[in-house]
Amino acid sequence: HDALPIFMITVPFENINVQNKIPISVDINDLYNKIVIQRRGGFCYELNHLFATYLEHKGFHVTRAAATVYTPNGGRSPEGSHMSLYVNIEGTLYITDVGFGDLPTSIIEIGSKTQFIPTYDKNGVYRAVWINDNQYALQKLRQNKWMTLYEAHLKSQSIKDFEDKISYNEHHPHSIFVRHLLITQPQSFGRATMTYHSLTLSNDSTKHKYDVTTNNYKYFLKKYFNLNVSIIPFEP
C-alpha cells in the first residue's frame, strides 16, 4: 500500500523523451536506469511496467491490462492503447496504475457488481466499477457526475503486446504524446501539470495557471517535478 503513493509523488508522468525524439525502451534495465538512477519519469508503459515488475518481485500477482482512455471532450484514445495495472489480493482486485495523468495516490478497489467503493484524494473522488465480467471502468466525480477516465479489459497482457501502441504513441503524428508536452505529478497541495504553454497547479476545488517560457521552464521542472533535463523545443 505504501509503495504506490511513494512512487507517484517521486516519479512524474512525462513524455520528454518523445518530444526530444529519444527512443523509448521498456527493457527493465533501461527503465531502472532512466527512472531510478537518472531520476526521470515516463509515460504509462514505462512507469507501469517498472512498478509492476517491482510488485512482482515483492510477491504480488500483477496484471498488465489494455485500457481505452476517454478524453474530456468526448473522444477516445486508440483502442487498448493505455496500459493499466491491477493486483489480485485474496480475490479482491485493486487498480495499481501509476502511469495515468489523473489518479489518486492510493490503490483503488474494484468493488463487487453492486457495491462501489469511492477513493478520496486531494484531486477528487474516484471509483472503479464493473462494466461486465471482463471489463472495469475507472471513474472520477466531476460536477456531481461520475465520468469514465478509462475502460480496461481484465485479460492479462505482456509488455510485448503493447509494442504497436508504444510505437504509435512515440511516432504517430496523431498521438497526443507526439503532438503535446505533458508532465504531471501529485503534489502536497494537489497536482502540478506542465505543457509547452502553461504550468497548472490544482486540486479538487482550485486551479492556478502560469505561463511557461524558455526562460522559466527549467525552474518549473526542478521545483515541481524534480527534473533536470533540457526539452529541445524550448532550446534555441
Language-model segment annotations:
Residues 9:
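Glycine-rich, acidic and aromatic/proline-enriched surface loops and short helix-turn segments
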Residues 13, 35, 110:
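Short clusters of hydrophobic/aromatic residues that line enzyme substrate/ligand-binding pockets
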Residues 19-39:
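Short, conserved helix/loop micro-motifs enriched in His/Cys and acidic residues
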Residues 49, 53-121, 125:
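Hydrophobic/aromatic-rich core segments of domains that either
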Residues 131-227:
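Acidic/His-leaning functional-site neighborhoods
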